[in-house]
């Protein structure tokens, strides 16, 4: 098959190189090297599960609808892409939580997992498909609405600097959960260690 599609494969490789070329040129001009090492490292044997559950930027805490993305992985039976989605999800999450600088800079939630959303839409759709034909569909859709509301409200809190970009802790998070106007007493909790 590779031999019969040699021209298409060469075109794809060339197009990929052209897409990457501006980044390589930028790195060469700015750093003097075509490949730039940011200086961090991987901790594959000691992954940082706080990426998923931590009060600082936990994916499931600040983007709670993603819990349903993961739940959908259990409802993909008989889907032709099931194995690909499972392998991608497990590898991608493991790679993201193994990065030494697990907070990924000042940002909202776990920005390093955003690129996974198109793939995770498949198990989420499988979950919706399965639940929508049961008596649990209305409670499920209410739950989806609530999780979406929490996510959007927290984005608003982040944009208003109620949620700190890098220094959140459990006590402060609980004090400002769905609270548009934190008090000075709440803000003092932000300075405490978790």
PLM-predicted stretches and their roles:
Residues 59-71, 135-137, 165-171, 188-194:
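Juxtamembrane/interfacial segments around transmembrane helices
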Residues 1-8, 70, 74-81, 121-143:
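Membrane-interface junctions at the ends of membrane-embedded or membrane-associated helices
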Residues 3, 30-31, 78, 99-100:
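Short helix-capping/hinge motifs at transmembrane helix termini and TM-loop junctions
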Residues 62, 66-67, 106-129:
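Hydrophobic/aromatic-rich transmembrane helices and adjacent perimembrane loops
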Residues 56, 63-64, 74, 120-121, ...:
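Aromatic (Trp/Tyr) and acidic
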Residues 98-108:
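Interfacial helix-loop-helix junctions of multi-pass membrane proteins
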Residues 7-72, 85-96, 117, 146-157, ...:
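Membrane-lumen/periplasm interface segments of specific transmembrane helices
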Residues 143-194:
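Membrane-embedded, lumen/periplasm-facing catalytic core of multi-pass transferases
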């Amino acid at each position: 098959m590779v031999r019969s599609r040699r021209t298409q494969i060469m075109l794809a490789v060339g197009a990929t190189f052209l897409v990457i070329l501006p980044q390589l040129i930028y790195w060469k001009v700015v750093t003097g090297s075509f490949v730039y090492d940011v200086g961090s490292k991987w901790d594959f044997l000691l992954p940082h599960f706080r990426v998923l559950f931590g009060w600082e930027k936990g994916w499931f805490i600040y983007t709670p609808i993603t819990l349903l993305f993961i739940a959908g992985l259990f409802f993909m039976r008989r889907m032709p892409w099931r194995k690909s989605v499972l392998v991608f999800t497990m590898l991608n999450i493991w790679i993201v939580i193994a990065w030494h600088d697990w907070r990924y800079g000042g940002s909202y939630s776990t920005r390093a997992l955003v690129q996974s959303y198109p793939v995770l839409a498949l198990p989420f759709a499988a979950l919706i498909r399965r639940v929508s034909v049961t008596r649990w569909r209305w409670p499920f859709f209410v739950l989806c609405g609530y999780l979406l509301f929490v996510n959007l409200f927290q984005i608003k809190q982040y944009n208003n600097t109620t949620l700190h970009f890098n220094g959140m802790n459990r006590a402060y998070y609980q004090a400002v959960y769905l609270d548009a106007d934190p008090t000075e007493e709440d803000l003092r909790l932000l300075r405490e260690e978790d």
